[in-house]
């Protein structure tokens, strides 16, 4: 077989155009190892093959180049967009990679006649109003709780709202004004919803004026209880403003991006993103990019801006602590956002203070991450030594969860590169086995998980943990032998005689005596961490499946209740719980339910 000719960099570069575009560098296996953009393709690509001035990391990358492909674009901004689409899809070895697949959450104020306040993640619907995005779900829930306390907006689903006959607990604790049972007029509720919307838009001054006016009007009409309620609203709002608003002058939307590196460069990097919407500081989020070691912080910041805002909501202002190429990034982000986006790399005054705070948070997050990683490295090394293994990195753990054989779920969680990899977790519905047969369930999930690896797709993890004892590990071994994966490293994690944490025994195939590590052994702590996560993930899925099954089965067992009537009942009362608490008269109001059938349903459920 004739060898592939060596890559002739000089000849290749000579034929490149002096135009903007994107280049893809490939190794001898045809894998893309780096994607880059250029204002001038000829100059940029040629610079990689100069004799001096290349960083060691770049030299290593260039030594692996076996081919280069280029795409000419109409502008630098277009090249930047294409570059980052390719980086997202190809995950090249030498590109800085930011992984954050989950979309950001929003507060939603629905378009209902009595608007509902809620948590939303996913596509936006023009019928509703959305506020955010927020950096994490916790900040959304905190905002909802604050808005409930101040404006008493409902949070119940529309199906529950339309079928209530008495106010819920939230009304009793003054977190809802009770529109479901007409305890507040539509006009008054609409005013409260409008004030909540204005507040979320950052127009807190307007909201305070509105509530103050209503307080004075109530006092003049000697409605002192109502006036006191407005007074409490004003006090709560002022406290929130003191804590959350960073720019009381106007409803500012801005992101603040700060970067720090371990040991002032050369090590791990953290990018902290602080979000301000409507003048409110919504919190921050830290990112730890892959392959960023050795790059200067300006390059890291540029990669973050280009990758993070791809197909995401973009604010009017982005404050960055590094000298990034403003013109091309502003052009790209403005095009993406559909409105003008300004990148400020030299903030002054209060905005400089925001950047300093974001930088401090980035440094703190990096310090905490490195501390956790050091602990994980210690645990992983201890486990390697205890198991007499080398090169231990990727661990997968399996658990089975069911209730007396019902709603069986298997979980697989993944530990890799010193941390749990949530995006790689998987749940498996287990059917077609004898209910309660844990061994059959384990055979099923392992066969489904590893059959593609047996066919040559992908690689086995370095270690497979099975939550269970000798029977479970034997079942796992049978599957691996059947699949031809005899070199799989299997370890069973049995709870020990007293089933107490710290007394776990490690079971090995073909080894009669189990291994029991001391309670304070770092390797045991890592196994417990992974096993507990598999257990949690399995139970969560099992409970969801069980709840869904029982909602249907409780009504299905009642003679005369078919799919149509069951759906009518669940829709009217907002679920099985609502059906159970309904009176005979209330049940009778559902479509297709006669008096006799309502009495039968009531008897069966009580």
From Swiss-Prot:
Per UniProt, subcellular location reads as: Cytoplasm
The SS bond pairs are none
Q: Which PROSITE patterns match?
A: GIY_YIG, UVR, UVRC
What sequence ranges are listed for the domain GIY-YIG? 18-96
> What family is this protein classified in?
Belongs to the UvrC family.
In terms of Pfam families, this protein maps to: GIY-YIG, HHH_5, UVR, UvrC_RNaseH, UvrC_RNaseH_dom
Q: Which GO terms describe its cellular component?
A: cytoplasm; excinuclease repair complex
User: What protein name applies here?
Assistant: UvrABC system protein C
Give the Gene3D superfamilies listed for this entry.
Answer: 5' to 3' exonuclease, C-terminal subdomain, GIY-YIG endonuclease, UVR domain, UvrC, RNAse H endonuclease domain
**Keywords on record:** Cytoplasm, DNA damage, DNA excision, DNA repair, Excision nuclease, SOS response
Its domain of life? Bacteria
**Primary role:** The UvrABC repair system catalyzes the recognition and processing of DNA lesions. UvrC both incises the 5' and 3' sides of the lesion. The N-terminal half is responsible for the 3' incision and the C-terminal half is responsible for the 5' incision.
**Where do the UVR domain residues begin and end?**
205-240
One Gene Ontology term of the molecular function aspect:
DNA binding
Major location category of this protein = cytoplasm
Give the record's GO biological process terms: nucleotide-excision repair; SOS response
PANTHER family referenced in this protein's UniProt entry, alphabetically:
UVRABC SYSTEM PROTEIN C, UVRC/OXIDOREDUCTASE
What organism is the protein native to?
Nitrosospira multiformis (strain ATCC 25196 / NCIMB 11849 / C 71)
Subunit structure, as described in the record: Interacts with UvrB in an incision complex.
